[in-house]
Amino acid sequence: MPFISPPERDEATDVRALLPVLSAAERAAALATGRALVTGARARADERPYLDAFLQEFGLSNQEGIALMCLAEALLRIPDDDTADQLIAEKLAAGDWDSHSGRSSSLFVNASTWGLMLTGRLVDLPGELKGGDTGGWLRGLTQRASEPIVRQALRRAMKIIGGEFVVGRDIGEALVRCRREPALALCSFDMLGEGARTDADAARYADAYASAIEAIARADGPAGDVHGRHTISIKLSALDPRYSALQRGRTLARLLPRVQELARLAAARGLGLTIDAEEQDRLELSLEIVEALLRDPATRDRPGLGLAVQAYGRRAPAVIDHLVALARDLRRPLAVRLVKGAYWDSEVKRAQERGLPGYPVYTRKVSTDVAWLACARRLLAAAPLVYPQFATHNAHGIGAILAMRPRGVPMEFQRLHGMGGLLYDEARRSLPDFPPVRAYAPVGPHADLLAYLVRRLLENGANTSFVNRFMDGSVPVEQVVADPETQLAGLGEALAHPGIPLPAALYGAARRNSRGLDLGREATLDGLRAVLRQDGAAASSALAPPPPFARPADVEAAFARAAQSLTGWSRGPVDERAACLERAADALEADRDRFLALLVHEAGKTAGDAIAEVREAADFCRYYAAEARRLQGAPTMLAGPTGEANSLEMTARGTWACISPWNFPLAIFAGQVVAALVTGNTVVAKPAETTPRIALAFGELLHAAGVPKDALSVLPMVGREFGETALAHPALAGVVFTGSTATGRWLNRALATRDGAILPLIAETGGINAMIVDSTALPEQVVDDAVNSAFGSAGQRCSALRLLCLQDEVADRIIEMLEGAMDTLVVGDPADLATDVGPVITTAAADGLRAHI
């Protein structure tokens, strides 16, 4: 019973489908409860956790909050003093600290502001601080940042900040703290850390999860009601370094057994195990794994398996419906933790970068709030087969759940450790028979805090966040607990955020963004597999024999035709030429399948690289069309010192020779050719000898879009023959070249021997690309970027990483992680979607690499 993503719709349609959620009576009850909770909690402001106070003062809406978060993240893992000192100086110089000093009643917040915590106590304040000159003192501190006491003080302060997010450095320490603190009597433990980058990482995380399950079971004593005990949350990305839809086969073969082993262990110990939600492009695969776990006969009679669902995902209602149907079909209870969502910023940016039709998440927070309520109603209706777990720090959300909850339905609330404590304490104090509250409790060394810290701040540090406004007395209670359905109704038709354009409109009026593919959907991948099959229609054209190479006489004839057509083409309106390019971009996207097959089968591109190259070619067409209109649309009027009219007009130079490489046989070929054409020039283009079909197909597309055939000739032929003929032709007006440095030098020398005016040579050649890494960089991000840069396109691009320079203190760790990540790469057939690294372009190229190694 696989989950099938619903058809993509516009965001407004998805939002309207959620409504209505609350009845009038439920809405009134939710508002009354929320109002009472906020009022009661504000009366106890001095009891709030440090972290709530910190987030109210230092959100992500001011430079000082960002500076402190950078320090909190990086100082905990920078091993060397010099780098730490430089970071401290940079971040302390970045903010207006006077605006925060003394403003909060929390000692913790002011200590963080001044950076004066040292071994658990405050040092004496200097005189200028007592007089209120915090900014002046901090500027002086910046200049003295090499002093060990300053470094120690700030490291201590940052550890305290980190400790507010983390319940213990290991599971043993966490369990001791839970026994000591009543607010942690019921927890779901999360082992901190980035997703695995190596198989060794994955094995280490699996061992950590298993050890934690055993430790929790020992600490909890004999098994009872699974929902009355501590539970554990696991991230699938921590258990396999290649957890993605493109690696589905590997994931099911390697990740699934590992998760099954943990689920069986948790079931045997009577503990709940929850699969954490991650990025939306992993949603379908994660649900496939959850279904396999539910069907496992070894755990069938043991409740406790659960997963998190992110309400900001526009597929969340369909996911809830699928899970309920699955639980009923299998007669297997399932716990569902309903959260708002933790990756909103990256989901939006990723959709923009990938050119997706829309966003996988709602663009307005109020829409997420309504979706959370709509999903909550579905879960409550499915209880007790589904055990709802509502994760919220929102007083209105608590009130709405209590208003919707049928009498006697088992459920629980959840909160993040360090946040929401006062809100739930007030709820337990003032509301009879309040449901259990579980703390989501991260466990791990402070150095592993980054990913968790950033997600929590993005969730809770924004101006619109309930946590940010909850205790702010300047914000009216009615505004804090406002009903999201009412807020949504006030938006009218503007249900999608007007400040977040669709990915296609990312560049505004200038041009349209190129269209990509959502590779997280199995239906998309099935279509792509069909396109790339060697016996498919698209591949057949890619594998057809290429035409015979042109000869020098063909070059002469092409230049003659180009020179003859120059006047008519260049004197036409720039709008007409730009429109040709825009039609070509549209046609390229409409015929994407054929070009993907050509790139994979002729150039050896992997599917991901091929998609990116088609998009880049379309972007070139639209970008140069927009630039030509800007530069040539009207003359630029210049000053006339003696009353005369002076204007500057950009015109075509003549006929250009465009020589493109095999490593980007579509994108670079297209960029060279369309830039010359749209400005009124004519072109004789020589594509790479190994990839002629791609260039010829794009040339045909340009002709169909309106470029005269005589204005563009595409001549596959031997490079030296073309160069010797073209560079000697009297009609030549310039050369555009991308390729080796040696060939670029030869072209430069050949042009220098010509009589007459000096012709322009626009040359892009090779080089050594380096990445320089210091100890402030997160190792996982370094490895991700290094692997992508060095081995994308099999390393066959001029921008590929060639030299990685690492600071001594972190070199060994990064090298070990890099080696492990490289070991997980799949080298093979580029038509296989699981392939990461395809073949190099020729046998000679492969032999050269082997010789170099």
List each language-model region with its residue ranges.
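Positively charged, amphipathic and often flexible ligand-engagement surfaces
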Residues: 1-513
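Catalytic cores of nucleotide-enabled group-transfer and carboxylate-activating enzymes in metabolic
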Residues: 156-176, 180-187, 197, 212, ...
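Residue-level signal for inorganic ion chemistry
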Residues: 562, 577, 599, 621, ...
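Conserved small-residue-rich beta-alpha loop and adjacent elements
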Residues: 634-709, 766, 780
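A structured beta-alpha segment of the ubiquitous adenosine-cofactor-binding alpha/beta core
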Residues: 645-647, 713-736
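ALDH superfamily catalytic-core signature
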Residues: 701-707, 728-729, 734, 742-853
